[in-house]
Amino acid sequence: MASHVDLLTELQLLEKVPTLERLRAAQKRRAQQLKKWAQYEQDLLHRKRKHERKRSTGGRRKKVSFEASVALLEASLRNDAEEVRYFLKNKVSPDLCNEDGLTALHQCCIDNFEEIVKLLLSHGANVNAKDNELWTPLHAAATCGHINLVKILVQYGADLLAVNSDGNMPYDLCEDEPTLDVIETCMAYQGITQEKINEMRAAPEQKMISDIHCMIAAGQDLDWIDGQGATLLHIAGANGYLRAAELLLDHGVRVDVKDWDGWEPLHAAAFWGQMPMAELLVSHGASLSARTSMDEMPIDLCEEEEFKVLLLELKHKHDVIMKSQLRHKSSLSRRTSSAGSRGKVVRRASLSDRTNLYRKEYEGEAILWQQRSAAEDQRTSTYNGDIRETRTDQENKDPNPRLEKPVLLSEFSTKISRGELDGPVENGLRAPVSTYQYALANGDIWKMHEMPDYSMAYGNPGVADVPPPWSGFKEQSPQTLLELKRQRAAAKLLSHPFLSTHLGSSVARSGESSSEGKAPLIGGRTSPYSSNGTSVYYTVTSGDPPLLKFKAPMEEMEEKVHGCCRIS
């Protein structure tokens, strides 16, 4: 401490310097005062203790005594090297610890008391002592960035690969770059590789797995509980031992066992932040709504927001699955109970399902048309000449057109109305019955001559004047897939009954108009008839919607008018 004269002299000098310099000088002087005061208090304490010792030797008994571990830790916490040396000389173990497993060496490595650290190590303190969370003194020194203590601990044989309860080694916890360089240099000098590091990390879990296999071989109960009510699955869940937990779950270990505090394995995994373990337990039926004795759910025990979000997502998925299962059961029972009712249960596919269904149909349809168009072009060129030759021979031989196989007109009309005479199906539509030959689905050719114009004979004078529905279609460009979709959708929506008079209008043509209409019918992609027999007339513009044209029904023909036989 400076004398009074020195302080006055310094004060006169400080009046001439800037304010910043005076502030620095004041801070320096204050630090010296505090240091002197601390030294004074420590000296005073020592004098008191000496005086007490002298009095105790006089025959007076102690009234308060402390355990050696408490006294040693208290002296280390105060950085009292002399008292620590006194305890060590009196045969007090340097490895004594408190209820948390913390030794004097741990405490000195945290507070950076280098002198006491050397003193404890020189008296045989365990350099790799572990507390309740498996932290060694090297973990503490590396975490705090005390490079001088790290060097001392390594010189005394500290384990560089020691793993704590979180699975971290000293170099995992070190954030100070110079200290980390020292640790990594020592690891490289000892020949530590990444394979060895991984092996050391997995060693605790591997030991637990081997113990579980021994219990299985001995036929012991895997739901065994310890003194706190914890099972092996609790331990695996708290430490994040996934392989050990999977082994236990595969052998039927219960996931809902509670310890004395009401904790299930999922609570332990949530409290210690074991996210993969929580997912594994939930997938095996662990309840996210289970509560402890303190009415806490697993999500209430989480400290990390990321883990809370994960548990909320798992809970939401679990609720959705349960609701879907209940809905499925209720729908099955409802269908069973209302089997006789009509239209009470309406099932609609979702918009996405319908869109995917239409897309698949259109893709398949496009592929089908690419294959079929090439085959039909080749087929058309092959038998197109046969058609003309057949028609010419028939016109020369028989002025009255007829079917190659005699069929009554009434039966023919009946078959058409019932849909028994169908042409090849193209684009999901039925090909019309025409007066020419067609290629059937099995590859055969169905031949048919022109039919006489019965429409005039049975009182439909306006039918013959109707222009052919495909008269303007021949000159159009090939239809696109979009047009095919629109035509097909329109044809499916129409649900009108088949009009038999369309047959007469389609077959009552002259030889010239018939030859012009053959090409669109044989080589065209779509038919003017829908799958339910409805005739659809298309305008010249391909983009216009199809129009339905109705005609008066043909009167029922009598069988006596046309016989099945004729005189040639």
Curated annotation (Swiss-Prot):
Residues with PTM Cysteine methyl ester: 565
Residue stretch(es) of the prosequence: 566-568
GO molecular function, one term: protein phosphatase regulator activity
Keyword field contains Transmembrane helix: no
Lipid addition sites, S-palmitoyl cysteine: 564
Biased composition (Basic and acidic residues): 386-403
Entry's localization field: Cell membrane; Nucleus; Cell projection
Induction of expression: Inhibited by TGF-beta1. Down-regulated by LPS.
PTM entry text: Phosphorylated by PKA and, after PKA priming, by GSK3B. Phosphorylation by GSK3B reduces its association with PP1C and enhances PP1C activity. Dephosphorylation by its associated PP1C results in enhanced association with PP1C, but reduced PP1C activity.
Low complexity bias spans: 505-517
Positions of S-farnesyl cysteine lipidation: 565
Single GO biological process annotation from the record: positive regulation of blood vessel endothelial cell proliferation involved in sprouting angiogenesis
A GO CC term assigned to this protein in UniProt: nucleus
UniProt keyword list: ANK repeat, Cell membrane, Cell projection, Coiled coil, Lipoprotein, Membrane, Methylation, Nucleus, Palmitate, Phosphoprotein, Prenylation, Repeat
UniProt-annotated stretches for the region Disordered: 373-403, 505-527
UniProt ANK repeat ranges: 100-129, 133-162, 228-257, 261-290, 531-560
Stretches of the chain forming a coiled coil according to its record: 15-55
Membrane topology: Lipid-anchor
InterPro entries listed in its UniProt record: Ankyrin_rpt, Ankyrin_rpt-contain_sf, Pase-1_reg_su_16AB, PP1_Regulatory_Subunit
Presence of keyword Phosphoprotein: yes
Self-association state and partner proteins as the record states: Interacts with PPP1CA, PPP1CB and MSN. Interacts (via its fourth ankyrin repeat) with the mature dimeric form of RPSA/LAMR1. Interacts with EEF1A1. Interacts with PTEN. Interacts with ECE1.
Function statement: Regulator of protein phosphatase 1 (PP1) that acts as a positive regulator of pulmonary endothelial cell (EC) barrier function. Protects the endothelial barrier from lipopolysaccharide (LPS)-induced vascular leakage. Involved in the regulation of the PI3K/AKT signaling pathway. Involved in the regulation of angiogenesis and endothelial cell proliferation through the control of ECE1 dephosphorylation, trafficking and activity. Involved in the regulation of endothelial cell filopodia extension. May be a downstream target for TGF-beta1 signaling cascade in endothelial cells.
Stated name of the protein: Protein phosphatase 1 regulatory inhibitor subunit 16B
Source organism per UniProt: Mus musculus (Mouse)
Name of the gene: Ppp1r16b
